[in-house]
Regions:
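A contiguous loop/helix-start segment that scaffolds small-molecule binding in enzyme catalytic cores
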Residues: 2-4, 148-236
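Class I SAM-dependent methyltransferase SAM-binding "motif I" and its flanking Rossmann-like core
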Residues: 82-155
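Short amphipathic alpha-helix with an adjacent loop that forms part of the alpha/beta core around
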Residues: 65-70, 145-146, 206-210
Length: 236
């Protein structure tokens, strides 16, 4: 059997009680290529009283069947940063497991999508979410921002990363890309920050002066409800 266990947005202490109990009776693996983990692997091993092997992207994509064959003979737990179903990689893994008649159990945890409430915007007013890429391929970003604005919806922009080599797009990098593409203006008021730490609602020009940790994200607000506006101006 395969268990996909979310680790949440923080460190090893964010594992759920259910996830911890299940992991104690499994062969355990962890992937850290979909985001940046703030935790410590050795501390997590002490919590679950089991050794944990790290797996890379190619292990779960190119070596998918080999990984899943292991789940036919024993209980296997794969630790995933955030929530297990926030990345398409894990959807594909589940589909292949089902084709191989392997049972899969999801242990959910918090993700950037569930923690967005910290920004003070109403959840049902978010439109399409996109990632600002390192490449110049911005068509999907342009479409999302334009269409969301048309309907007064907020746009969540995730920032590109390559965790396996420790490369994370900064807010400053993303703002420059968006400015160069004329998708935002220097006097636009937007939200930028790292959930759980420093979050700012300010003009784009002022955000360049902020020291924002990675991984971070940006929200371009749509039409604001008066309560949303009060929260942004008084809390952030």
């Amino acid at each position: 059997m395969l268990y996909l266990i979310g680790l949440g947005l923080g460190d090893e202490k964010d594992i759920t009680l259910r996830g911890m109990e299940i992991a104690k009776r499994c062969e355990c693996f962890i992937e850290t290529y979909t985001s940046k983990w703030e935790g410590d692997l050795r501390s997590l091993e002490r919590i679950i009283e089991q050794p944990i092997k790290s797996v890379r992207r190619k292990d779960l994509e190119d070596g998918q069947k080999e990984f899943l064959n292991n789940c036919k003979e024993k209980n296997v737990a794969l630790f995933v940063l955030g929530d297990p179903l926030a990345a398409t990689t894990h959807i594909d893994l589940i589909l292949e497991a089902k084709r191989m008649k392997i049972d899969v159990k999801i242990i959910h945890n918090s993700s950037v999508f569930s923690a967005l409430g910290e920004f003070g915007l109403q959840m049902y007013k978010y439109g399409r979410t996109v990632t600002v890429p390192f490449s110049n391929k911005l068509e999907s970003v342009k479409d999302a921002i334009t269409n969301n604005k048309k309907f007064g919806l907020h746009t969540l922009l995730l920032l590109d990363l390559d965790a396996e080599v420790g490369l994370y797009m900064t807010v400053k990098n993303a703002l420059k890309i968006l400015l160069d593409a004329k998708l935002i203006k220097k006097n636009d008021k937007i939200i930028a920050g790292k959930i759980g730490t420093n979050i700012y609602y300010d003009n784009v020009s002022n955000l360049f002066e902020k020291n924002i940790e990675t991984p971070s994200c940006i929200v371009i607000p749509g039409k604001l409800h008066f309560l949303e506006k009060e929260y942004l101006e008084e809390i952030l």
